[in-house]
Amino acid sequence: NLLALSIGSERKYIPNADVNTSFAGTYWNSDFIFPNSSNVKVTETELRPLSLAEMRIARNEIFARHGRQFKDPMLNKWFYSKAWYLKINTKYSPADFDALPDQMNAIEKANIAFILKTEQNRMKNQTIFPDASTRVLSEYDVSLSKDVLKKALNEIYTAEKVPVGQKTTLSKVALKNVEQIEGILNTSEVKY
């Protein structure tokens, strides 16, 4: 069973088994994080329990409703797993979407700005992965910018009370997360 991803004119197939369902199980089996974000303003109360990765998906699902595809393969994998996204006949590469006349209504624009501001505030003022010593992070969790992942890496060492780079004294879960983040930081691929 394959999941088809079309990015611009390129079509790729990913085995469904490779689609990570451990991330936000609540959301994997539902259609939207915020089903009404096209016509109802998202509130701080609704964003508070979400992780950075969940907020990123919630923000990008507004774009996805208009057929936008993404440079980040994780976002494409996420949205191509949703029946509503598969039903959109015309999908646009990021460049083609950006060249279109404005697609968003005022509520969508406000929600995008509010979610992004909340993400930025959380990145500055809160621990990125407060449970990184007790839970293995999924590929969706770590699908963040390299700057955010560098901060998260330092936070994991701090939470474990271990000097940065002293991997041998990290807990098994923290070590797995550190290695996963370091692997991303050592690639040239840019997440945003």
Region spans (language model):
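Intrinsically disordered, low-complexity linker/propeptide segments enriched in Ser/Thr/Gly/Pro
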Residues: 2-10, 14, 127-192
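Zn2+-dependent metallopeptidase catalytic domains
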Residues: 15-40, 63-70, 74-76, 131, ...
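Second-shell loop/turn segments in exported
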Residues: 41-49, 65-66, 100-102, 137-138
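Amphipathic alpha-helical packing elements
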Residues: 46-87
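Extracytoplasmic/periplasmic, Sec-exported soluble proteins
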Residues: 47-54, 71, 107, 141-145, ...
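Stable alpha-helical elements in mature extracytoplasmic
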Residues: 51-59, 111, 145, 149, ...
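Sec/Tat-exported extracytoplasmic proteins
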Residues: 59-66, 119-122, 156, 160, ...
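Compact alpha-helical subdomains of small soluble proteins
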Residues: 70-125, 171, 179-192
